[in-house]
Regions:
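N-terminal beta1-alpha1 cap of cysteine-dependent amidohydrolase-like domains
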Residues: 1-47, 162-197
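Residue-level detector of flexible, active-site-proximal loop/helix-junction positions
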Residues: 2-3, 56, 74, 106, ...
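Short clusters of hydrophobic/aromatic residues that line enzyme substrate/ligand-binding pockets
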Residues: 6, 67, 90
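Active-site-proximal flexible loops/turns
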Residues: 7, 27, 60, 110, ...
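Short, glycine/charged-enriched secondary-structure capping and boundary segments
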Residues: 11-13, 30-34, 64-67, 114-115, ...
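A structure-centric signal for secondary-structure junctions around beta-strands
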Residues: 13, 75-78, 94-96, 131
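Cysteine-nucleophile active-site neighborhood
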Residues: 19-87
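Amide-donor transfer/coupling interface in amidating biosynthetic enzymes
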Residues: 44, 83-197
Length: 197
């Protein structure tokens, strides 16, 4: 979408996944405005939508939530999360999990009607739902450890030595439960498309 390529018709696809981005949801790019409009149109058609990182923040902002800087600055690495709600569509039920993330902004106020289902010390609204067709999360279930180190390498110019040292430590700590989150995303989409006989 950053190259201004959008589906010609909302009905072209059964559902939509909004990924991460190197830009901020507050940046003044026309494609961000177009994507925001697209979110509204897809929601009006009750399309299942998943937002990840940038997508998570943009969806919150579109529906009236607030996105702002994390007081601790860059949060890079693998961090523990509390799972507050296990929805019926989640095939695997857990109370805690870990996930990689790479960002310095976060959702600081949820849109009206949104329900938070995962949080951490630094992210009270790490993951949330809106209605029964939108699920959003701050972290990156699609990224393995090596990708996180690659991200760190290409962004070193904008990071302090302290940020880099902390990131290296956090990326290497523990084991990300990315498979659990990836499965949840598939479970969510699957709940909207039951198997055909």
């Amino acid at each position: 979408v950053s190259e201004y390529e959008f589906p010609n018709n909302i009905e072209s696809y059964d559902g939509y996944l909004l990924t991460g981005s190197p830009v901020s949801v507050h940046d003044d790019y026309d494609w961000i405005k177009m994507l925001s409009d697209f979110i509204g149109k897809a929601n009006n058609k009750n399309k299942p939508i998943v937002g990840v990182c940038f997508g998570h923040q943009l969806i919150a902002k579109y529906f009236g939530g607030v996105v702002g800087n994390n007081e601790k600055g860059w949060m890079i690495g693998n961090f523990p999360l509390e799972i507050e709600i296990n929805f019926p569509w989640m095939k695997k039920k857990v109370n805690t999990t870990d996930l990689y993330h790479f960002n310095k902004e976060r959702v600081i106020k949820l849109p009206e009607g949104a329900i938070s289902f995962a949080s951490s010390e630094d992210y009270p609204y790490y993951a949330y739902t809106i209605g029964d067709n939108i699920v959003c999360l701050q972290g990156h279930p699609e990224q393995p450890k090596r990708a996180m180190y690659n991200f760190l390498e290409v962004t070193k110019a904008v990071l302090s030595e302290k940020d880099i040292e902390k990131a290296n430590s956090c990326i290497g700590s523990g084991k990300s439960n990315s498979v659990v989150w990836a499965q949840w995303i598939m479970d969510f989409f699957g709940s909207h498309f039951p198997p055909k006989n």
